[in-house]
Amino acid sequence: MKMPMGNSGMKSWRTKTGTRIYRVLNGRCNCYLVSKDNRFLLVDSGTKRDWNRLNKGLDKLGATHASLVALVLTHCHFDHAENAAMLKNTYQAPIWVHKSEGDCLRNGENPVIQGSIPVTKLMIELLNRTRRLGRLNYAPADYARLVDDRLDLDTFGFPGYILHTPGHTPGSMSVIIDNEIALVGDTLFGIFRGSVFPPFAGDPKLMVQSWKKLLDTGCITFLPAHGSERDKEVLKRQYDKYNQL
């Protein structure tokens, strides 16, 4: 269920069991804060230019070093991980990342970016020629936990789990809350009307299979890191379309 903007000024959602999800940062990358019984789970960290906004948003919602259980990186592209080191230093937040991208985080290396449509394939080719993609590295940070195919969150105080949803990158993950709302990173986009297909993906076919995994969770709302929310019906139509290709 989507909630109107409250005193925090942030868009938020609430599941049937009362778990709240706040969009604590938007713009270059949507970052979400899951709230349950005064405990918080941050999903993605945004870019360093957004650090002040992220920090203010966390403070406004009452997230502290004692209540912020972890930072979950849906993957280690710079626009999701650039503030990871700052969050660890400021909030002592443990960082959770998929095991296939742990070295990327430790080295501050941006995983390979690949276009999934003709225009972005050309764009990446041109950027590679000029070596500009090498400028997308970020401050390294140590992870506290490596996630495999699934990590249950109940033991950490949250009704849900982390699910490996590869395709955009090898280590892309989604956070499933109450089998109702999924925080999906870049596994799907919400920019173009009626579409969820990301313009960048290392393995588009594998990504489409990850859509099936997301549909199987029973979630009805999908919150991407780029763009606006998408519902189950849109995702199902897109899965049916691209699964036939």
Residue spans of the language-model regions?
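Residue-level marker for buried hydrophobic side chains located in beta-strands
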Residues: 41-43, 72, 95, 183, ...
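Short, conserved active-site entrance elements at the starts or edges of catalytic domains
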Residues: 6-10, 133-158
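Conserved beta-strand hairpin/beta-sheet module of binuclear metal-dependent hydrolase folds
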Residues: 10-61, 174-185
